[in-house]
């Protein structure tokens, strides 16, 4: 089988409050606002692209109005996981930006360090520092 997928270009979420979401992703996680796209039909704001690094983006869509609380029983989306170089520095940055950690840095069952925070839209975010001994580092 030919591997046709070369990477994850972006993930997208619809947000309740764009300003608060931008503050979380830029101040707490350090993403950079890359560019905006307006609706072609109306010229109204539609999508804000945040640069994670190296061609990886998070799309934030304006206009969420219905809560979808995270729940293990739901089928489909569960959480985002973002890789970090230093789990403790990343956790401090999140807290310094005003967001409480749901789970402080700890060693996970996979051998990687992890910490958890919830974004302003109720989306669970896992921060992960990959250990050289973990299955993630050894794969491929």
Spans of features found by a protein language model:
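Conserved catalytic-core motifs of GNAT/GCN5-like acyltransferases
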Residues: 32-40, 105-108, 112, 132-135
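Active-site beta-strand termini and strand-to-loop segments that position acidic
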Residues: 50-54, 117-120, 130
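Core segments of cupin and vicinal oxygen chelate
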Residues: 14-57
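Helix-adjacent hinge/juxtasegments
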Residues: 60, 69-74
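N-terminal beta-strand motif that seeds the catalytic metal site of vicinal oxygen chelate
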Residues: 1-20, 77-82, 131-140
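Vicinal oxygen chelate
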Residues: 17-19, 73-75, 80-124
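Conserved beta-strand in the GNAT
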Residues: 59-61, 116, 126
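Short, charged/polar surface micro-motifs in flexible loops or helix N-caps
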Residues: 53-57, 65-67, 85-89
């Amino acid at each position: 089988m030919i591997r046709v997928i070369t990477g994850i270009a972006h993930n997208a979420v619809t947000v309740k409050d764009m300003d608060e979401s931008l503050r979380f992703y830029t101040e707490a996680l350090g993403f950079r606002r890359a560019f905006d796209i307006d609706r072609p039909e109306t010229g109204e704001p539609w999508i804000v692209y945040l640069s994670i690094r190296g061609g990886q983006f998070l799309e934030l869509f304006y206009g969420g109005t219905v809560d979808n609380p995270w729940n293990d029983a739901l089928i489909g989306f569960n959480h985002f996981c973002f890789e970090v170089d230093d789990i403790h520095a990343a956790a401090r940055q999140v807290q310094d930006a005003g967001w409480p950690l749901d789970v402080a840095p700890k060693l996970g069952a996979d051998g990687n360090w992890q910490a958890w925070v919830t974004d302003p839209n109720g989306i669970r975010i896992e921060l992960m520092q990959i250990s050289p001994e973990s299955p993630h580092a050894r794969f491929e």
